[in-house]
Amino acid sequence: MTDMVTESLSTGDGFKKYFEILPALTEGERQAAFRIRHSVYCEDLGWEAVRADGFETDAYDAQSLHCLIRSRASGGFIGCVRLIRVAPGDSLDTLPFERTCRDTLDRSIVDPAALPRAKIAEVSRLAIVGQYRRRRGEERTPGIVQDSDFGTPDRPRFPYMLVGLYMGVFAIAELHGLEKLFLLSEPRLARHLNKIGIANQQIGEATEHRGLRAPSVMDVRQVIDNLDPLLHSVFVVVRDELKGAYRAADFTVDSRAL
């Protein structure tokens, strides 16, 4: 037990030593996320058209919560992710996955339309800049947790950047009072997330969307409460960093969370 506690503390400390998670609250920070997305989704993957301004943006950015990861060594932003929320005041607004998977969702598992709309969001546009994800086989992925990311029992390693961004997703969701998060992803991503303790449930058949993508749902409280010590230590560091950034910016979120 002592070894597990020591290891979890060193995992959180290790993350804090090399990386920082922060919410993109200013226009400059949001533009940093848009530049990362352009580098990954437009230039590297070719999933979106290259744009003259170097920003990858869409209509959902205005209603999204954006998160960045920064390298402490370089001081530069190296990854991002966003949570798309339903447009405030628009009861008819739908999240992107609801349209893409309209005909394949299994509403007997969960019906997004029946949930409190202000309490749900979609995880979207997770990206890590190329130089940080170019191990063999990763050149065409914006960021995915692989079994090999954790190394072997003899030579373990921890995928700090990816886990940090996912912990940022859940910390931001908690701070903003979100209860359910949806994800449209390759089925293997959902499997890898489950393997490392980020519980998610597939809620429909895979559909074609730049390859086969399947919708899944994650319960924010359930995931946070059931993180193993290694992930939880990173989550605590990330949540504290986000809280500090919100306070410094005098940004209003759920006061109980701060």
Model-derived regions, located:
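Short glycine-biased active-site loop of nucleotidyltransferases that positions the nucleotide triphosphate
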Residues: 57-61, 205-208
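Glycine-rich acetyl-CoA-binding "A-motif" of GNAT/NAT acetyltransferases
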Residues: 75-78
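Short amphipathic alpha-helix that is part of the acyltransferase structural core
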Residues: 7-55, 62, 66-70, 85
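Short hydrophobic beta-strand segments that form the core of ligand-binding sensory/regulatory domains
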Residues: 82
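Beta-rich nucleic-acid/ligand-interaction surfaces
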Residues: 53-60, 188-192
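Acyl-donor binding region in acyl/amide transferases
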Residues: 88-218
